[in-house]
Amino acid sequence: MKKATTSAAAKSQGNSKMQKNANNGTAKDKKKPNLDKESNDSNSVSDMLAVTKDQEVHAFFSKLFDDDAGPSTSKKTQSGSAAAAKTADRKRRLQAEADANNNDTGKAGKLTKESEATQGARATKRKQARSLGLERTSPIQVNGAALACPLVRKSLPPGEANSCPQPPKKDPAAVNSLVKIIKAEPTEEGNNNNDEKETETIETHKADSVEEGRRVLQWILFPVQTKVFFKDFWEHTACLVQRSNPKYFQSMISFKMLDEILIRHHLDFTVNVDVTTYKNGKRETLNPEGRALPPAVWGFYSDGCSIRLLNPSTYLIRLRQVCTVLQEFFHCKVGANLYLTPPNSQGFAPHYDDIEAFVIQVEGRKRWLLYEPPKKADQLARISSGNYDQEQLGKPIIDEVLSAGDVLYFPRGAVHQAITEEQQHSLHITLSVYQQQAYANLLETLMPMVLKKAVDRSVALRRGLPLHTFQVLGNAYKGNDCGSRKQLVENVQKLVTNYLMPSEDDIDEAVDQMAKKFQHEALPPIVLPSEEVRTVHGARSDADEQGNCVCDYKFNKKTSVRLLRANILRLVTESDGSVRIYHHVDNGLDYCKYEPYFMEILPEEAKAVELLISAYPFYLTIDQLPLESSARKIEVATALWEHGLLMTEKPFK
């Protein structure tokens, strides 16, 4: 292990692929699309997308707890733009369908009845043909600027949603509910308790990221307090909060913002976008190949299909901010999926998931039915289920309609399905947390480590099995009551008791490995303006008259520093004795896009990092770091700061 002689020498250690690419995890993520200016209507939506300035993000979150909703995100699409955005192929198809439906006299005798199977086959073929043709179609442009593709209206027949058989109409007597429904009074929206209001006065660069995450969760669940939520609902039962405020979540996403994303970014079917439907008791994914351009996506939507955006936080900076702040509180990856369902439709069959789900209703309405896990083994499930038939479900524990502004939480293993109403579409976000965060996951990491160490230490575990083992043990020999069988069983149990009890150090090591996994999965932090000037992101370099590089920052032993976030790094001692700092500062916006980022330090330098971890959220002077010399203290602090892990109390400028 090489000892760094200068701060610049303390470079990240990684695989050879990472070292070859100087821009790995940095330049690619920080590059922003060059968006053309359009009408005021488009600009108002662009402000909500990933190109939004950090100042607007900061302003948005500073208002979260004073105002129950953000500003209006878009204006109504003008009729002229709507007409211009429709393709000629779609006009011809819609006109042909209208003619076929209305011409009852001239063609009635010529038409023959088709079987349901034939109709379904033709419908599928028609969808595929249209989507394959439109996936290469560029958005219509006016004066060189692409227009937003409006929602194509299609008259859906009234009646049951497009799934068969459907759950019966809501019957309060049929609901086996122990779920508490919280209704927020309009006069109370946006109010928070006193300790939260006091926290708001803390300067951004002095705030505790874990507490900030709790406040965002409180905003989502209001008026349910977080302490009450974790006591009464978390991993136990569903919690439904109904509000009379459709604007509560509107600043996070809208239908028009989704359309802008499809136009301005390259999204592919299957990778970024799923098209799903649930008809005749069968769940189908209808993803074509290629890019998900608006005409293809809205064509599927008009045919009653649900649209799922798999990584909306990549493109929506406000949603990404919610996820990055919440991951500090939950100490795990916080995912987000976006679901857009047309009126009178259902996109997914009944199933359960392996995540704690927060359903945030942004637009429209959707009826949700939740059921108890079919088996006890499914409670707090670790793997998502397959699809259930309606006949396999018992009485719902909740049967309620979510309106815009409402939020529904339910734990892992809760079977659920959702259907839109006849005249209402639905746009909701599902935040997912605590996937693979159970004690079982810890033990799966811990026990192989314990066994390996025990085998190395104990010759008893390395001794060979008795020759007669296969003749006395096994399912076929359960009825054998011989003494040798009992002796072998006792020997195995004693070995487990004597050698496989994990020590405190073993548990620490296993938790470090799980935390290292979180560093690989986490979204990179969003550095706010007041933080940027205190971090490497605000540093600038220039050249003097001789061409030497001159940096605009310099540390001394009186400089005060702290970690950028509470969970920005993980100090891990690997099995070979090396000490590494794993972090997620340079992670990509796509899930595990790069190999894990880490920097290797000397074992004696670990104490300085441990002190920074324990001191958070407070600042320490560099002179307080427990290292032998001032030069070494400054060197270590500078290296951590240059990697984006530290923040100074005062800007250098």
UniProtKB/Swiss-Prot annotation:
Chemical reaction(s) catalysed: N(6),N(6)-dimethyl-L-lysyl(36)-[histone H3] + 2 2-oxoglutarate + 2 O2 = L-lysyl(36)-[histone H3] + 2 formaldehyde + 2 succinate + 2 CO2
Residues involved in Fe cation binding: H351, D353, H416
Function, as annotated: Oxygenase that can act as both a histone lysine demethylase and a ribosomal histidine hydroxylase. Specifically demethylates 'Lys-4' (H3K4me) and 'Lys-36' (H3K36me) of histone H3, thereby playing a central role in histone code.
Top-level taxonomy: Eukaryota, Metazoa, Ecdysozoa, Arthropoda, Hexapoda
Pfam family for this entry, one: RIOX1_C_WH
InterPro entries per the UniProt record, alphabetical: JmjC_dom, NO66-like, RIOX1/NO66-like_C_WH
Gene responsible for this protein: NO66
Modified sites of kind Phosphothreonine: T137
Record's keyword annotation contains Metal-binding: yes
Protein name: Bifunctional lysine-specific demethylase and histidyl-hydroxylase NO66
Protein keywords: Chromatin regulator, Dioxygenase, Iron, Metal-binding, Nucleus, Oxidoreductase, Phosphoprotein, Repressor, Transcription, Transcription regulation
EC assignment: 1.14.11.-, 1.14.11.27
